[in-house]
Structure formats: C-alpha cells, structure tokens
C-alpha cells in the first residue's frame, strides 16, 4: 500500500509543475493577444493593437456601420 508520505512526495511536485505550466501558458497567451477592431452601428472598439503610425492612419479611415437606407 502507498503511504501518505510517499503520495505527498509524488503528488505535490506533480501538482506544482502542472499548475506552473498552466500559469505560464496563460501569461504567454495574454502577452501575444492579437489586435481586434470591432465595428458596430454605434461605435468602433480597438483592443490589443500596437498603435504604429501605419495603424493610426488606418484607424482614421474607420467609420461606424450605417445600415439605414440612404436616398
């Protein structure tokens, strides 16, 4: 039979390693988030983007979506 001491010596390091790997994945994912531009009928939402001069020029051309019939 397994003793409690042996189980804790095996399980605790495995849990610590798995938790560390999961946390590193979350942190690296957050640092590599992509740029999202959401255009709706009311607003333009820009998230996670690097505001380079080229991106700023692009962002200046954005307009909200107008779905009304134009005569």
Curated annotation (Swiss-Prot):
The record's subcellular location field reads: Host endoplasmic reticulum membrane
GO terms for biological process, alphabetical: transport of virus in host, cell to cell
Work out whether the entry's keyword set contains Transmembrane helix. Answer: yes
Listed transmembrane segments: 5-27
Query: In its keyword annotation, does this UniProt entry include Flavoprotein?
Result: no
- Which regions of this chain are Cytoplasmic-facing, per the record's topological domains? 28-71
Could you tell me which InterPro entries the record lists for this protein?
Answer: TGBp3
The UniProt entry's GO CC annotations, sorted and at most eight, read: host cell endoplasmic reticulum membrane; membrane
A Pfam family that the UniProt record links to this protein: TGBp3
Primary subcellular site in the record, as a coarse category:
host cell
Stretches in topological domain Lumenal = 1-4
Q: Which UniProt keywords apply?
A: Host endoplasmic reticulum, Host membrane, Membrane, Transmembrane, Transmembrane helix, Transport, Viral movement protein
Look up the further comments and give them. Answer: TGBp1, TGBp2 and TGBp3 seem to act together for cell-to-cell propagation. TGBp1 is the main movement protein that physically cross the plasmodesma with the viral genome. TGBp2 and TGBp3 would facilitate TGBp1 function.
Q: What does this protein do?
A: Plays a role in viral cell-to-cell propagation, by facilitating genome transport to neighboring plant cells through plasmosdesmata. May induce the formation of granular vesicles derived from the Endoplasmic reticulum, which align on actin filaments.
- What name appears for this protein in its UniProt entry? Movement protein TGBp3
Q: Which organism is it from?
A: Poplar mosaic virus (isolate ATCC Pv275) (PMV)
């Amino acid at each position: 039979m397994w003793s409690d001491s042996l189980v804790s010596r095996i399980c605790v390091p495995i849990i610590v390693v798995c938790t560390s790997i999961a946390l590193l994945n979350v942190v690296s994912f957050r640092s590599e988030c992509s740029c999202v531009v959401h255009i709706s009928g009311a607003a333009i939402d820009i998230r996670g983007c690097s505001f380079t001069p080229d991106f700023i020029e692009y962002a200046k051309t954005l307009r909200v979506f107008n779905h009304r019939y134009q005569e």
